[in-house]
């Protein structure tokens, strides 16, 4: 079974780096633990935000706080099931290692810098669900910016 590595981070890189971006796709929907985490948190796929919503920040204005929190709990569930998070704590080194392994990113790569910045920005947050969604949103937004700037070049 394929390891569910850096769930949303890897998905963000693949989704935004590929020519066939699918902004309507639900965040995390391609991973094995997605359905399990939805069930554990009483959500359906329709309740989960799309990549486009999250990368643009629209999820913050288009949804109630309860929806934001529940989506964050699904993200945290997937991260925790893969050993990338325990409660509200990241395993930063494992995240970086898995990220580099999965993406082939090299030291100095802007994608790694974005991941590090997003982890730093959210590391002191105590609510595991909110922390997870904000981390995912940060990485997706950074990926969108990096993809747009590389397309413009």
Curated annotation (Swiss-Prot):
Its main location: secreted. One of its GO terms (cellular component) is extracellular space. It is found in: Secreted. Residues 1-19 form the signal peptide. It comes from the Eukaryota. Keywords: Behavior, Disulfide bond, Pheromone response, Pheromone-binding, Secreted, Signal, Transport. GO terms for biological process: response to pheromone; social behavior. Disulfide bonds join 37-77, 73-129, 118-138. One of its GO terms (molecular function) is pheromone binding. InterPro entries: PBP/GOBP, PBP_GOBP_sf, Pheromone-bd_protein_Gp-9. Colony queen number, a major feature of social organization, is associated with worker genotype for Gp-9. Colonies are headed by either a single reproductive queen (monogyne form) or multiple queens (polygyne form). Differences in worker Gp-9 genotypes between social forms may cause differences in workers' abilities to recognize queens and regulate their numbers. Belongs to the PBP/GOBP family. Homodimer. This is Pheromone-binding protein Gp-9. It comes from Solenopsis pusillignis (Fire ant).
